[in-house]
């Protein structure tokens, strides 16, 4: 009897784990999504497993796991060939900024070319939304050839934020969400004029499994509530 109960508990646990909604989120949006998921669980709607990373990491995980939803830049989701999205729900607009370390004098985007700015961190363009936006900006503003020797390319936005916060680099190209999250640790930030990069539309992209998943559909509705919109606005979306 005891053996049977153990097997029954294991079966139930396995069933619960299998039914847990799994989502993937661009690393630059971890902070607001963590807050959203906390609110979702506190209201008794269930637990959601979320993984965070750059786009390459997300696509790799989504192919191996039953990911139902991906929260990221719509352009990245549309151009990749590995996953088939059936719907996109708007969450907000991403804003690219230049964050600078404490003690660094930085008043305009042109200051990137100053001799006083020795190092510029940014995420990798092929793997991260704001790396792509950063490269667009540097090329469109005709800065790239003048600053390419200063560039330090890393995998994710959080890495760039960390380097700026600890003054391992003078400035970094990140999103407004990350800059606001680190505002006490950095010197400040300047928004990159929208004219220099393609608009960034942050969406919840639904995969096929989401269509018939009640938990997934409920979460999508939850994302549209006024309380959740307030969270996204607070984090610069």
Regions found by a protein language model. Name each.
Residues 4-13:
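Sec-dependent N-terminal signal peptides
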